[in-house]
């Protein structure tokens, strides 16, 4: 009810929190954050839903980089409780604390981490995705069987092939 999707970036000027979910390209994100930093008040928290791009790099050239952090949601976002709260080198500790409190109020389970390739989950889970694709290439099983095995046998909410197809990897 309190989330308002916008297509006009100027509509964000009054927001307390902005969550960017643009394509996974550093230059796109840097341009969006530079725009936001110009017209959002200094207390507005600027976050990105990136799954792997450096928070430090995104915040490097903007005003008040201490207010920039990552909020990495997992697919399917309405179902998955885990949410990585990612800090860059300039991110203020109080910003991370505010974001953790906020995400708890959304019914999410925040985990704090520093900006590093893949953060926590993707860094550790990438071998699952790679091995699923390798198994498919080697014709170990059909794609739907591989996905079902990981969903049903390992408790994955989505199979690794299904997920990488959804997120475009």
What are these regions (language model features)?
Residues 7, 48-50, 114:
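Short loop/edge segments at beta-strand edges and connector loops
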Residues 64, 85-116, 126-158:
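Internal alpha-helical scaffold of NAD(P)-dependent oxidoreductase catalytic cores
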Residues 4, 19, 69-71, 111:
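Hydrophobic/aromatic beta-strand patches that form the interior of the parallel beta-sheet core
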Residues 1-16, 25-27, 31:
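Conserved N-terminal Rossmann-fold NAD(P) cofactor-binding segment
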Residues 1, 165-169:
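Short, intrinsically disordered, charge-balanced linker/junction segments flanking boundaries
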Residues 19-20, 48:
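Redox-cofactor binding/interface segments in oxidoreductases and associated redox assembly factors
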Residues 161-162:
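Short, charge-rich amphipathic alpha-helical segments embedded
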Residues 25-102:
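Rossmann-fold NAD(P)-binding glycine/threonine-rich loop
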């Amino acid at each position: 009810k309190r989330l308002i999707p916008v297509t006009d970036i100027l509509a964000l000027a009054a927001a307390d929190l902005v969550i960017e979910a643009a394509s996974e390209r550093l230059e796109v994100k840097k341009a969006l954050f530079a725009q936001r930093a110009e017209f959002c008040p200094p207390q507005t928290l600027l976050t990105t839903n990136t799954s792997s791009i450096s928070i430090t790099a995104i915040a490097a050239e903007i005003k008040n980089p201490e207010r920039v952090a990552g909020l990495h949601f997992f697919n399917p976002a309405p179902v998955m409780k885990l949410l990585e709260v990612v800090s860059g080198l300039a991110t203020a500790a109080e910003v991370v604390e505010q974001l953790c409190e906020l995400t708890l109020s959304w019914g999410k389970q925040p985990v704090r981490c520093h900006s590093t390739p893949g953060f926590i989950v993707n860094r550790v889970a990438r071998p699952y995705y790679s091995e699923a694709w390798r198994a498919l290439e080697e014709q170990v099983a059909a794609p739907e069987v591989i996905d079902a095995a990981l969903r049903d046998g390992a408790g994955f909410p989505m199979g690794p092939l299904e997920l990488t197809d959804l997120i475009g990897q």
